[in-house]
């Protein structure tokens, strides 16, 4: 188990007046009520399943079939990915892109093909130099004015730029250049290109959640004159099949959550199990990860309860035995806890015990030990924050950051996400993850810094809480906006680290790395315009509605 910190003495006396010391929490109830308790009483009929299988094989043949040129092949693969069905054809797509990578005739390609090729190859880990874009610059080093009229080319360059790594100045310039010109052009474009551009400016492909983006692209793709009817039909059926699976999972989780009765027992805590499921379905939506999705949703639900216990209700003197109990991970510790803490402590242990039982048949119990240790470290870092709040202690920014990165929970979620995966995950995966590799660090920075900016900008943090933005402003004598700009630069730098982590040879298989990429994507989607988890913003409501409530019309 992780080392204990709860025994560290506090230099500030503790008040015995619990009511005075108790933080004040005021979270809104769930907007979903019991809506997801019951799953629609329907299954995909045998005929539709058979059609799905037939279409799948047709699409597979199309992916590997020779095409007149690489542009057509790249565009088709891009559509397969954009419609959210590439998980069926991982090997075929990889093989085709490998061929395109080695048969390079990029000198003849226009801006559209050069950018599309760059993005798809980078997404799959191939080293493609950003120098391929130099031919679109003039002698002064600026992008040629002639490319500004090529809207589809600009759109692809814009999307490609989000795959940039450190030192690729031309792609930093490209984001600004393409954003400006696409914003100017969008009003004069015809549908569906206007919708593609408008949506891209709000959400890039690289940082969007694949299933959310697929739901949107389905509505756009069918209006593209040259769309592939077989691919479109397959993607629609597949979307509905996966949606039904997700609804069944969420119904099961909602029943578990309702039986815990935390809404009554712990009224101080956020009731966000539906939003938690949406978060985790962003980490992995594919059917083969059903078990992992259900386990990780329960973990994020319990982590949310633990967070609110530390942050929104418990006194510091109550948190010491609570942290001790989590560190010791023993149900016997329950007798040492205040009465209101007992249900959440028991539920926490039950979730991990169930996890152990579910993975035991494959001999994967060792994975759960890593997951427990990650949860223990999270609780320990919460206790440090609680001590700072009690003492009204203002740490230096670096001191704050060292503790704040673990409190965002992303290292814990990344490690726990591996528990429900298949044989691609090994003991080496967990050893690697436990050593805080760069890609997990990067997704954690994205989470922490986006959350910090959001909390300060939208005043989502209690006045007595220690704020990273306030720490930075005080230490460096800057305004709030200047602090936001610095934090956002850290986020952009972390995205470059994520992208770097996918370039071959990778430290771990792509499926392992995808968990950190998708965790970062969730933050970009949910937290760009406020805390979309706690306050259930437009992104969360819209995503949950389109992915879990509304099927695609066939």
Curated annotation (Swiss-Prot):
Cofactor (UniProt): Mg(2+)
Any one Pfam family match given in the protein's UniProt record, by short name: Terpene_synth
Protein name, please? (+)-delta-cadinene synthase
- Return the domain comment text from this UniProt entry: The Asp-Asp-Xaa-Xaa-Asp/Glu (DDXXD/E) motif is important for the catalytic activity, presumably through binding to Mg(2+).
Motif DDXXD motif, per the record, lies over: 307-311
What family classification does the UniProt entry report for this protein? Belongs to the terpene synthase family.
Q: Where is this region: Disordered?
A: 1-23
What does the entry list as the binding residues for Mg(2+) 3?
451, 455
Gene Ontology terms, MF aspect:
(+)-delta-cadinene synthase activity; magnesium ion binding; sesquiterpene synthase activity
Gene name on record?
Answer: CDN1
- Note describing how the cofactor binds: Binds 3 Mg(2+) ions per subunit.
| Keyword Nucleus set for record | no
| A biological process term (GO) from this entry | response to bacterium
Which positions in this protein are listed as binding Mg(2+) 2? 307, 311
Q: What does this protein do?
A: Responsible for the cyclization of trans,trans-farnesyl diphosphate (FPP) to (+)-delta cadinene.
Q: Per the entry, what induces it? A: By bacterial infection.
- Note the InterPro entries from the entry: Isoprenoid_synthase_dom_sf (IPR008949), Terpene_cyclase_plant_C1 (IPR044814), Terpene_synth_N (IPR001906), Terpene_synth_N_sf (IPR036965), Terpene_synthase-like (IPR050148), Terpene_synthase_metal-bd (IPR005630), Terpenoid_cyclase/PrenylTrfase (IPR008930)
Q: Which UniProt keywords apply?
A: Lyase, Magnesium, Metal-binding
EC numbers listed for it are 4.2.3.13
List where Low complexity composition bias occurs. 1-16
């Amino acid at each position: 188990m992780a080392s204990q910190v709860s025994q560290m003495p506090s230099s500030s006396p503790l008040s015995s007046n619990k009511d005075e010391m108790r933080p004040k929490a005021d979270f809104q109830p769930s907007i979903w009520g019991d809506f997801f308790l019951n799953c629609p009483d329907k299954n995909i009929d045998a005929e539709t399943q058979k059609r799905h299988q037939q279409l799948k094989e047709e699409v597979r043949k199309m992916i590997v079939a020779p095409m007149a040129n690489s542009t057509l092949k790249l565009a088709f693969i891009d559509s397969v990915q954009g419609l959210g069905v590439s998980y069926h054809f991982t090997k075929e797509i990889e093989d085709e892109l490998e061929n395109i990578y080695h048969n390079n005739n990029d000198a003849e390609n226009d801006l559209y093909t050069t950018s599309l090729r760059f993005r798809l190859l980078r997404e799959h880990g191939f080293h493609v130099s950003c120098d391929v874009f130099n031919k679109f610059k003039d002698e002064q080093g600026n992008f040629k004015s002639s490319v500004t009229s090529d809207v589809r080319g600009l759109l692809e360059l814009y999307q490609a730029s989000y795959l940039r790594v450190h030192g690729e100045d031309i792609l930093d310039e490209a984001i600004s250049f393409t954003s400006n010109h696409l914003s100017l052009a969008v009003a004069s474009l015809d549908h569906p290109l206007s919708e593609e551009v408008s949506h891209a400016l709000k959400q890039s492909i690289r940082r969007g959640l694949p299933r959310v983006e697929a739901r949107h692209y389905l509505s756009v793709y069918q209006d593209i004159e040259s769309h592939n009817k077989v691919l479109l039909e397959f993607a629609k059926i597949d979307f509905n099949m996966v949606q039904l699976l997700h609804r069944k999972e969420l119904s099961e989780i909602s029943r578990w959550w309702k039986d815990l009765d935390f809404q009554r027992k712990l009224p101080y805590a956020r009731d966000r199990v539906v939003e938690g499921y949406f978060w985790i379905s962003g980490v992995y939506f594919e059917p083969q990860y059903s078990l992992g999705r259900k386990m990780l949703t329960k973990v994020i639900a319990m982590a949310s309860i633990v967070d609110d216990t530390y942050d929104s209700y418990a006194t510091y003197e109550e948190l010491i035995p609570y942290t001790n109990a989590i560190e010791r991970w023993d149900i016997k510790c329950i007798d040492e806890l205040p009465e209101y803490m007992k249900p959440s402590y028991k539920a926490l242990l039950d979730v991990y015990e169930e996890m152990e039982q579910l993975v035991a048949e494959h001999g994967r119990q060792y994975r759960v030990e890593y997951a427990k240790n990650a949860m223990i470290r999270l609780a320990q870092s919460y206790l440090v924050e609680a001590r700072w709040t009690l003492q009204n202690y203002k740490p230096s920014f670096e001191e704050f950051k060292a503790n704040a990165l673990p409190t965002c929970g992303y290292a814990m979620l990344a490690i726990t996400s591996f528990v429900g995966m298949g044989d691609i995950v090994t003991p080496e995966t967990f050893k690697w993850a436990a050593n805080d590799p760069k890609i997990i660090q990067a997704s954690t920075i994205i989470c922490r810094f986006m959350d910090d900016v959001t909390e300060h900008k939208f005043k989502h943090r209690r006045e007595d809480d220690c704020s990273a933005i306030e720490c930075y402003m005080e230490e460096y004598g800057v305004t709030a906006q200047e602090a936001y700009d610095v934090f956002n630069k850290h986020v952009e730098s972390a995205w470059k680290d994520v992208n770097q982590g996918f370039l071959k040879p990778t430290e771990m298989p792509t499926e392992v790395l995808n968990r950190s990429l998708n965790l970062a994507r969730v933050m970009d989607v949910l937290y760009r315009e406020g805390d979309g988890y706690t306050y259930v913003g437009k992104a969360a409501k819209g995503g949950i509605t389109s992915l879990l409530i509304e099927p695609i019309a066939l």
